[in-house]
Amino acid sequence: MLKACFLFGGKSFEHEVSVSSIRSVFLAYISKKFDITIGGLDLENRLQFFSHEEFLERFQEYSRFEKADRPANYEDLKKFDVVFPLMHGDYVEDGSLQGLFSLFGIPFVGPSVLSSSVCMDKEVAKRLLIQAGLKVADWISLGPFEMLEIEVVTEKIGYPCFVKPASSGSSCGVSKVHSAIELEKAVLEARRFSKKVLIEKAITGMELECAVLGLEDLLASRVGQIIPQKEFYDYESKYVLREAAVIEAPANIPDSLEKEIRQVALKVFRVLDCEMMGRVDFFYDGELYVSEVNTIPGFTPISLYPKLLELTGIGYNELIDQLLEMAIRSHHHRERQAPLAPNSLCLP
């Protein structure tokens, strides 16, 4: 039996979402192929391993792993055949953790260091998508030392608009702004989560999502829709007030629109060099806009990624097995293409 380690937690604003994801997987996933160990990163990114019983007893849904009392060495992860980081946000979804796995030669589920970094920075991803001929909402970015110019926002973006961290997920730090008076407060809130801030034109329309799975051959799932019962689908709506949004899976949309979304989702995946898994989010107001790509989508009880793939014919156990197997296959492929050893010469 192959050995797999499922990781959760980390020094991230989305720490609690990760705990919920790992609980959901642990309670639902039954494998005949993999022997599963659970590893947690505390709020200072210290690693600790847990028995199944200890994990379930210690961590409830959306709880926190404050401090490791039996810290382990990251090199201990090398004893596993594959690692599945069900983790979200800074340090764990932005390429940092992926770089560590790559450095130690550990197979892992998810995209490369570069793809993780690109998708985490919403502005960089937008620029690449535009270059590929895809539509995104208009935006202005504010770097860490740039001042907010309200007149420029009013003229170029208008209201309502969204102010959001450039590199955060789960709607952390996102505000919907209706007038210039609200801008400064929203920018300050977004800067709590990211040095760079985006001010983005609000698209009034449908919020749609498509799950993508695969390596060489990609599969785009059926399309789901988020129907917020509040003004927008913020962190509280997603994880605290679950009745604050209606989730339709599959979405009640024309077949032609679903086909277009699935095709565009595959194109987005390839443009941003993603692999294995990802959820592509869209807005639709008569035209289709790419919102963002989530390279480690949630696996919480309300998460659409596994639900949409199940609608497409891939059950929960099969999905997890496929992801773990893809990670091992992708790692072996990268190893075959590894650069020359330091003492090798590349002569003409």
Regions found by a protein language model. Give the residues of each.
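A short small-residue
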Residues: 1-7, 241-250, 304
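ATP-binding N-terminal substructure of ATP-dependent carboxylate-amine bond-forming enzymes
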Residues: 1-109, 113-114, 118-120, 124, ...
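ATP-dependent carboxylate activation and anion-phosphoryl transfer catalytic cores
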Residues: 2, 254-348
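Active-site nucleotide/adenylate-binding loops and adjacent lid/helix of ATP-dependent enzymes
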Residues: 2-8, 12-13, 20, 36, ...
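Short, hinge-like loop/turn segments at secondary-structure boundaries
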Residues: 53-57, 127-128, 155-157, 180, ...
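A glycine- and small-aliphatic-rich helix-loop capping segment at beta-alpha/alpha-beta transitions
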Residues: 99-108, 179, 184, 312
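Phosphate-binding site of ATP-dependent enzymes
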Residues: 178-263, 284-289
